[in-house]
């Protein structure tokens, strides 16, 4: 999992991710993590890859622009710029998968799995 590698190797990202995930995950109980995987994974992909990408253009320019917007959505403070960079890169992967497969199910499933795994791992480590 690329996120785990980036988390270990980039201290600024690790700090930024911990702040963001603590803000979002700390108050949740374990069963809530299921919803944290499903709802943002589905709704964000429908918005950014299902609506925005076709509106901009089903091409790499559209993928780049929608991914930048996706990254900015994850900004929770100016010190959180590393998390925005990471979300933008992930958005490029999700957008590229939608563009190359012509199927929204691929990025939706990838996003849900990413959210579930990262939420579970963070919750285990930070309780």
Regions found by a protein language model. Name each.
Residues 9-26:
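Membrane-interface interhelical connector segments
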Residues 1-8:
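Hydrophobic core of alpha-helical transmembrane segments in multi-pass integral membrane proteins
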Residues 22-127:
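Transmembrane helix-loop-helix hairpins at the membrane interface
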């Amino acid at each position: 999992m690329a996120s785990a590698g980036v988390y270990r190797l980039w201290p600024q990202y690790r700090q930024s991710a911990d702040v963001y995930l603590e803000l979002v995950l700390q108050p949740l109980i374990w069963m809530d993590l299921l919803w944290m995987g499903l709802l943002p994974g589905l709704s964000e992909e429908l918005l950014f890859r299902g609506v925005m990408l076709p509106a901009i253009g089903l091409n790499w320019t559209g993928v780049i622009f929608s991914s930048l917007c996706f990254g900015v959505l994850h900004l929770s403070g100016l010190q959180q710029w590393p998390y925005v960079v990471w979300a933008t890169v992930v958005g490029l992967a999700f957008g590229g998968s939608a563009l190359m497969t012509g199927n929204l199910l691929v990025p939706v499933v990838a996003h849900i799995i990413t959210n579930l795994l990262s939420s579970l791992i963070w919750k285990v480590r930070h309780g």
